[in-house]
């Protein structure tokens, strides 16, 4: 009995849909997004069918309390809803994330089986965050072996040429060093 718990009612309904989908359309997946009344994991059952992908909102690059609750319930695939470049985090005219933040984030996603990403906020500061956007795209090629440092070198040498690349790396190093605390912990 779910009583007046609308989140639980929705989770039970979605679990039933997933079970029916699995029977009627084997191999198909159902993406569920914990949000508002369903932000907490269900209480009346302890697992979802293996055709469910949970699209999580509360994970950047560390195991938050909510993330840990979900990992106990769902060991399957995940989607992630990220807020890396949403304008309400800060001024849309200043950089918000750094290559190091992205490296940690992508490695976290790889470790926990994230298969899809929804970006809330597009990123609009190409001149100042160009290396960060580049690292975000390239890290997925080989998260286990690539590093933000080597990708920033690659970006600067490709975008500015080998002569100006060294100067631009110094510029970006100083810029990202000044916002690293915000990017990693105060977001």
What are these regions (language model features)?
Residues 2-187:
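Substrate-binding groove of N-acetylhexosamine-processing glycoside hydrolases
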